[in-house]
A protein has these predicted regions:
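Aromatic-lined carbohydrate-binding/catalytic grooves of carbohydrate-active enzymes
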Residues: 169-204, 297-304
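Glycine-rich, aromatic-flanked loop segments that form ligand/cofactor-binding clefts
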Residues: 173-178, 205-253, 289-291
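Aromatic-lined carbohydrate-recognition surfaces of secreted/lumenal glycan-active proteins
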Residues: 224-231, 289, 317-356, 412-424
């Protein structure tokens, strides 16, 4: 009898303990699910009395508020009268890469949504949670890839050489041109393409894509189709009324390379690019990578007032790019391919879209993988406090990756970060260094030290042998 009473008491304590434990856990969980966002760059402190300024948080940083205190400081004015200064301080947590940090900030700099926190031109972007699937017949792969041009694929024996090099050096993916830098289509496609272009598919350099895909898959190589989106000379020639021009005089706008750009507002080009992507998916590619998914560089947006982007829907640049990627993702979902987007390397470190339409959280929320082009040679003098970023591959990649991870921390369904890294020597950069195996290792280590284990090497000539 005594035993039964003791057993009953024991069970009761267990139930009560479980009840309180569950309630405590639920409360903790509930607290962590409510976020606020910083409205500007703000100082962070080690305690509520602001004894030590330990850094800053950028605009739009996601935080949790755990405590609020009113701090009263007494002092005297010049006449000896006692005065009080009241400051409301908030104890918050935020994620710095993968660590949760606890700091204090002044009140008055938080709002409840990211849309409220960002600048006016980004307030209509969609930062809501999106489903990111894994397909049963197309498993995700942690990519360690090489860019392989269509010419390398078509050149007799070269693809075999690159496959052997990949096997020996732990490379498991090739990024292959499907729609190239001038808008050329690289393998024969169906008549569906003819609705959008008369000449882009006339002389494809890869005569038969089927044996290429088979060879890649037989050798365990994950196949990614690179599709250049809005830099398209062929489409521009066929559709001169869709290119970006100067408002006064109608002259075609070009960057320093002399190439014209089609506006990213052109929905016919959206459809064309996605139709090409569907052809690639049907051919057996595992993933579609959209490159040049941006507006052309316009001197930081200073030229926007004199350029005609043919913006009939009155969208911002960032809205157009996000809507394009969203459209592509929806259209390609039934083909069970993953979607990735290439963006400028410094987008993760920038508080805006760099006047390109590439706003980090907007792009990352839409695609499966985001590939910032983190070539150290492409970072200007003094960026990240480095005199010559090209000569500091580890530090450049580390800081750029860190900033990118922290931008991902602001949204619920971010893309996996898979940077492009430099496999070439930038002889045009003053103070540059020669790149070889050690510089590749430095870049990979910088990412790995931050938990990023996917990357792609870019060499425009595909001469990768000297980098391993």
């Amino acid at each position: 009898m005594k035993f039964m009473k003791k057993l009953s008491l024991f069970i009761m304590f267990l139930v009560i303990g479980a009840f309180f434990s569950e309630n405590s856990y639920s409360k903790e969980k509930s607290s962590n699910s409510y976020y606020e966002y910083t409205t500007e760059k703000i100082k962070i402190y080690s305690d509520e009395n602001k004894k030590e300024n330990i850094g800053t948080l950028i605009k739009g940083t996601r935080v949790n508020v755990y405590d609020t205190k009113e701090i009263i400081k007494k002092s005297k004015d010049k006449k000896g009268n006692e005065i009080e200064k009241k400051t409301v301080m908030k104890k918050i947590t935020y994620k710095d890469v993968h660590k949760t940090k606890v700091v204090w900030i002044e009140d008055g700099y938080l709002v409840s949504t990211l849309n409220e926190a960002v600048d006016q031109r980004f307030k209509n972007l969609d930062f809501t949670k999106k489903e990111k699937k894994e397909y049963t017949d197309n498993k995700r792969v942690k990519v360690r890839g090489l860019y392989v041009s269509a010419h390398s694929v078509a050149l007799k024996g070269r693809l075999d050489e690159l496959i052997e090099l990949a096997k020996k050096n732990n490379i498991n993916a090739f990024i292959i041109d499907v729609k190239g830098d001038y808008g050329e289509l690289t393998f024969p496609m169906s008549d569906e393409i003819n609705k959008y272009t008369k000449s882009a598919n006339k002389n494809p350099i890869i005569k038969d894509i089927e044996p290429v895909i088979k060879k890649l898959k037989d050798n365990g190589i994950y196949a990614i189709a690179r599709i250049v989106s809005f830099k398209d000379t062929i489409y521009a020639k066929e559709n001169p009324y869709k290119i970006i021009v100067y408002k006064y005089g109608g002259k075609a706008f070009t960057n320093s390379d002399g190439l014209v750009w089609v506006s990213a507002y052109d929905k016919n080009l959206w459809e064309y690019n996605v139709t090409v992507a569907k052809e690639a998916a049907k051919a057996g590619f595992n993933e579609i990578q959209f490159d040049y998914v941006r507006f052309p560089a316009s001197n930081g947006g200073k030229l926007d007032k004199v350029l005609n982007y043919r913006n009939t829907d009155n969208l911002t640049k960032a809205e157009a790019i996000q809507k394009y990627l969203h459209y592509a993702k929806e259209e390609l979902e039934s083909y069970q391919v993953y979607i990735s987007a290439d963006i400028y390397g410094q987008v993760g470190s920038s508080s805006d879209d760099m006047a390109l339409g590439q706003f980090w959280e907007a792009v990352s929320s839409e695609v499966d993988y985001v590939s910032p082009m983190m070539y150290p040679s492409h970072y200007g003098k003094g960026v990240y406090g480095l005199a010559v970023p090209d000569a500091n591959p580890y530090k450049t990649i580390y800081q750029s990756t860190k900033d990118s991870i922290n931008r991902n921390n602001n949204i619920d369904s971010p893309a996996i970060i898979r940077p492009w890294i430099q496999a070439f020597t930038a002889a045009w950069v003053k103070g540059h260094i020669n790149y070889g195996p050690n510089e590749i290792k430095d870049q990979v280590k910088a990412m790995k030290d931050l938990g990023v284990d996917e990357y792609i090497l870019w060499s425009p000539t595909n001469r990768y042998e000297k980098f391993f």
